[in-house]
Amino acid sequence: MEYFENRDRAESFGEAAQDYDAFRPKYPAALVAAIMEAAEASAGPDDRAPRILDVGSGTGILASQLRTAGAEILAVEPDPAMAELARPKGLEVEVSAFEDWDPQSRTFDLVSFGQSFHWVDPSVALPTIRTVLTPGGTLALAWNDIEPIGELKTRLDATAARFHTDGRTASLGTAGAEDTFAHVEHPAIAQLRGAGFSPKETTFVDNLHYSKHDWLSMVFTYSAQLTMDPVKRAVMREEMSAEIPEDGLDARNEALLVLASA
């Protein structure tokens, strides 16, 4: 089953909107700068702010970073609870699944997806993206992928595996097998090429430190945990907590950016 076909997981985030906004990470500054460079190139030399459509915007984490960097943003988000947390950040948000969204003849220099492209049907989304991009416009797909550093990762993965016997792990990775980052071509690349886009991948690495509370709070905003039985989820959190030192953990974000020209 593709991620976008699993509606229980795709529609699970609203119940955790506050924690999602508080604990999901921002994107590396260099990744945001790369998106802005592409958007400004698409906008041309007339000194206007680049227009960006941010799809599956959630609580506006990526969108607010792009707005701060100087872009004019329209966010599209299917979950009303998530959208309500994005609007106070100064974002215009339209509540809709992207597959049902009406562009109303509007066009954009860049279309971005932050941690969200896997939740849309590419056979519907990619043709729509083509219609809303200005000539020379760019599609940007971004995923944060944060893992503990060292042997703690092995212990936490083993704990997650005991609770997710279907092969899911605690977070959504960006490439290779489901929920696991691997240094192989991202599966979206073939979808983009098949739709006539020319994609290029870049990875941005940030070294991070998390308190025990913040790490666990982040992990339990992922759909693999949000769709668990609540009692089972609480036990999993307790067992993971027992593995993490009181002073927290070091982690690495290998954030992936795919820029694709139409």
What kind of feature is each model-predicted range?
Residues 36, 64-67, 126, 130:
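A structural alpha-helix within SAM-dependent methyltransferase catalytic domains
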Residues 76, 113-114, 142-144:
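Residues lining the SAM
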Residues 179-262:
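Conserved Class I S-adenosyl-L-methionine
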Residues 109-123:
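A short SAM/SAH-binding and catalytic strip from SAM-dependent methyltransferases
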Residues 51-55, 59-101:
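Class I SAM-dependent methyltransferase SAM/SAH-binding core
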